[in-house]
Amino acid sequence: MHVSRIIAHIALATAITATTVSPTDAAWGWTVKSTDEVKADKRDLVASRGLRGLIGQASPNEVSPANVPVSGIPLLGDKQPSGYPMLPADSPSTGSSLLNDDLLQENPVPPANGLVHGVPLLSSNQPLQTPMLSGNGPITGYRFFSGNESPMLPANSPITGLPLLSGNIPSTFEGEQISNGDEYQQNVDEDKGQNFGHSVSGPPTTTLTGPHTKSGIPPFENLVAPAKGSMPNTRRNGYQFFE
């Protein structure tokens, strides 16, 4: 009994002197490996990893057959596994049957003016849905006019869909005057010294008198197209007025 204790103490003292372990760590059984031992452990670890890699890439054997990879999915080799039947040459993968001569014979040929999947067939004698346009045929509500014919606008019809103007609107016709709501007058042309229409005195004004007494732009109901064959005077702003 005493001999075993002496041997244990000698072994402990030898371990303490051979390593850099503190007395506290030695008492708990801690040891410090030398540099050579650490390098050897690293070499063993690398070698073990490389061995496992070589095993995964090894040639087919009892563990890894030729047509069974590591992931468990069978490979398509010379002999296909029985779990994967071959598809016949005339069988589509979608499950629908292919069209053959027998199937085509069962379906009659549609007539010339019949429907194929809801789409009408157009033949030479089938009328079109779009009507032919004649000389005065309507197109979206508009009427064709010849070269010497001018369309007449209704009395209360706005032009280009614009609403009728009413109320006190600021003037934009500088140097012009409109009387009786229909007659166009213009100031004296300073360059030519001529007076177009009635003379106007005082500063340039733009007023409407008579039944349409309003200031500003005249209402559209005063605009009518010229009579056929007439050539009205034009204003520089594009409006045309007639009595």
Curated annotation (Swiss-Prot):
Has a conserved RxLR motif that acts to carry the protein into the host cell cytoplasm. Lacks the 'so-called' EER motif, which is found closely behind the RxLR motif in most of RxLR effector family members, but the presence of an EER motif is not always essential for the translocation of every RxLR effector into host cells, or for inducing a hypersensitive response. Residues 199-216 have a biased composition (Low complexity). The keyword Signal applies. Residues 187-243 are annotated as: Disordered. Induction: Expression is up-regulated at the earlier infection stages. A motif (RxLR) lies at residues 49-52. Residues 1-26 form the signal peptide. Keywords: Host cytoplasm, Host nucleus, Secreted, Signal, Virulence. The lineage of its organism: Eukaryota, Sar, Stramenopiles, Oomycota, Peronosporales. This is Secreted RxLR effector protein 28. The keyword Secreted applies. It is found in: Secreted; Host cytoplasm; Host nucleus. Belongs to the RxLR effector family. Its main location: secreted. Effector that significantly enhances susceptibilities of grapevine and tobacco to pathogens. Acts as a broad suppressor of cell death to interrupt plant immunity. Completely inhibits cell death induced by cell death-inducing proteins, including the PAMP elicitor INF1 from P.infestans. Reduces the transcriptional levels of the defense-related genes and impairs the H(2)O(2) accumulation in N.benthamiana. One of its GO terms (cellular component) is extracellular region. The gene is RxLR28.
